[in-house]
Design a protein with these regions (language model features):
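Alpha-helical membrane-anchoring segments
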Residues: 1-453
Length: 453
């Protein structure tokens, strides 16, 4: 606790890094949402599906009906533009977080690490005075301009970025990644037909080189970014590394998010120099004196947030078994591109009285993304089983020109899964009635044991 007390959270520092970070995050959210809309993903992922896989405790978050689902995306566009401009920031920052997080909570089959990262960043933006310079709020005198802000308002974002990198590196210290170069062997092989680098990428040693370098990079890049002496070289490495991963791996916009976000590690002078290139009519600035009671409250909240962010990636250690198999504590733990998992899931609805059963065609109810994700993720399998039970309870079916009514159906599935290039293994035995297994945080002892060979 003595070390914590010595941390000077409230030392004043230039607001410039916070201003640029505000603009960068707003731009990412704006462009990312436009990309999402132009690709037609709103319709494919949030309008067409018949069911959604909500997060435990957030099942009450439901999609809007039909084309109303465009509304939260429009709100993101508006609020992200306002965040960029620093306009009505007190309202636009919370709106950006709420509208984006609402979308992310709808369906875990769309979970991506950088979406989770952006939810955290937009949440933190609510509590920092990122609009107190270079903003329309200042221009229209809605707020008093500030040249400086407390150190924690910038440090909290550096911490969050550090968490992403360091835990991503720690997660790579495992057998599949370092000793088997998986799943990189699989993904790099997909580029073997490239005219320039194809013959190189199919070489096994290249996959091992990428695996080991990726582990070392993630674990230590933050420390080089924090040092003024090595920062420029480290950032060049950030750009090259993330460009290569974007080019070779199915990783979405994550590399671009990290490239622009890590600019916050640069010195205040660096950011001030950027802002100085733009004309800005400065007004008289103020420095706010934070009362001791407020300091204690802020310090407590910061420490609580830090501890929470340290616990979440480590919660998997509370469970037994292979993490890639049971996925207990896998999400929100910054395990970036560590797993290639494929599954084949055949579901059956069985009448409890007649024992007659029918095989389900999953594509009739699920999108391609949902089916792919569900077939390997235990919690989603249970949710799908509950959906099928509700769907077929007391329903009437016509089979071979005969009419049957299903009473109190049980849901069974025969599921085989392959992890990181291994042969497909039995994941869930057909004998289980999946509709009777509660969807909780309890250990998933109903899964078949994992053979790591």
């Amino acid at each position: 606790m003595t070390v914590i007390k010595k941390l000077n959270f409230f030392k004043e520092t230039s607001i410039a890094p916070l201003v640029i970070f505000r603009i960068i995050i707003g731009a990412i959210m704006l462009l990312g949402t436009l990309r999402f809309m132009l690709k037609g993903w709103i319709n494919d992922l949030y309008i067409q599906p018949q069911t959604f896989f909500g997060y435990l405790g957030f099942e009450w978050v439901k999609p809007l009906l039909g084309n109303w689902m465009y509304l939260p995306f429009i709100l993101i566009l508006i609020s992200s533009m306002c965040v960029i401009l620093g306009f009505l920031y007190k309202y636009s920052a919370p709106l950006l977080f709420i509208s984006f997080s609402y979308i992310e909570l709808l369906d875990k089959s769309n979970y991506l690490n950088h979406y989770y990262f952006l939810s955290l960043i937009t949440f933190l933006l609510i509590f920092v005075p990122a609009n107190r310079s270079f903003s329309l709020d200042i221009y229209f005198k809605r707020e008093n301009e500030r040249k400086t802000v407390p150190l924690w308002t910038i440090g909290i974002f550096k911490f969050q970025l550090s968490i992403v990198y360091i835990f991503a590196g720690i997660a790579k210290i495992e057998t599949d990644w370092l000793l088997n170069a998986q799943p990189l062997k699989i993904w790099l092989q997909a580029h073997r037909e490239m005219s320039v680098f194809g013959s190189l990428l199919k070489e096994e040693w290249v996959a091992y080189l990428f695996s080991w370098f990726g582990c070392v990079y993630d674990m230590f890049i933050v420390f080089f970014l924090l040092s003024r002496k090595t920062r420029s070289i480290a950032y060049l490495l950030v750009v090259v590394f993330h460009f290569v991963t974007w080019f070779l791996l199915p990783i979405g916009i994550f590399p671009w998010v990290m490239i622009v976000s890590t600019l916050i590690f640069f010195s205040p002078e660096f950011h001030e120099k950027i802002l100085s290139k733009f004309k800005w009519k400065k007004s008289s600035s103020v420095t706010l004196e934070i009362q001791n009671k407020s300091k204690k409250r802020i310090r407590f909240l910061i420490i609580s947030y830090v501890l929470f962010q340290l616990f979440i990636p480590l919660r998997y250690s509370l469970y037994t078994g292979n993490l890639f198999w049971n996925e207990e504590g896998f999400r929100f733990s910054w395990r970036v591109m560590l797993m290639h998992k494929e599954g084949t899931a055949t579901f059956y609805v069985r009448d409890s009285k007649t024992k007659r059963e029918i095989q389900i065609r999953n594509s009739q109810f699920l999108s391609k993304t949902q089916e792919d994700q569900m077939s390997t993720q235990p919690d989603m399998i249970l949710q799908y089983a509950q959906f099928l039970k509700e769907k077929f309870s007391d329903s009437t079916l016509i089979i071979n020109n005969q009419t049957y009514t299903i009473h109190n159906p049980s849901i069974h599935a025969s599921i085989f899964v392959s992890v990181n290039g291994r042969l497909s293994q039995l994941f869930i035995d057909k004998n289980h009635d999946l509709s009777k297994i509660p969807y909780t945080l309890a250990h998933r002892n109903w899964l078949e044991p994992f053979d790591s060979k």
